[in-house]
């Protein structure tokens, strides 16, 4: 029998050996038994409670501990250029850590907040030029940049918390563009086969079609990237597909607003920046959820098979995102309240 190091533990959920000694299993992300607990604030308790309910419905066991205070502790601190470069120095043979060298610390992303600020300021500057100088040349830039305000920072968030550091930025960009477009092609093709109307059932069908489009595109990349089998990899790949879907869709809706007969500058700003902000917890989050579900099923079966998409956690997470998507499209509560609830659930 092999001798384990003193810090080695077996994950209580996936039963894989945690050779890193980290608080959370590098294989499935579950909390290790006997790990020290950090204090969390009231907001963390609320979000953890919601997460526990969803975790139970989707087949998870045990409590879900979210250390929100630690997770965002680096956001408002000053960081050096070297720290920025280190974030993106990953994914190659020389920069991907070995399993035993994967960070033991709880992820503390921060650059995603800088991306959010950069995109928001850029959108406001483009809008300022549009209104002040009546310059319509900036409209395409405003449409595209504002459509990225919500989805792209969350994609960078997933990139930063990908503790295996085995996916480089260029791969993420490729998945964002081609994965997003592939999911749209699949979605539009399915809409030709299953046309929808304004009925409640049609709203559910439309949500299901879009979620299927994203999970198929995500799974295509997962089976292509055969050595990317960590749970965080599924979050990142699915999030990249969802971000691409969201940006292209949001740009389209903003363009529709621009073509409206009663168009005003204020309405255009509301549609462009408002729609972009809601991307924080829309397709990018739903894509990440289903991507994680596919990876969880794949961990159990090892070999990729398209039939696995419709089993276990993958199917349960697909149903969950379809329900969230349907709720998103169905005006039941005041708009801001409803979107706020969905943002909390998705995050």
Residue ranges and their predicted role:
Residues 8, 22:
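Residues immediately within or flanking Cys/His clusters that coordinate Zn2+
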Residues 13, 24-347:
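Hydrophobic alpha-helical segments at protein termini of multi-pass membrane proteins
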Residues 1-4, 25:
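N-terminal acidic, proline/glycine-rich, low-complexity intrinsically disordered segments
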Residues 1-2, 11-16:
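Short, intrinsically disordered, charge-biased short linear motifs at domain edges
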Residues 4, 18, 32:
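Cys/His-rich microdomains that often coordinate metals
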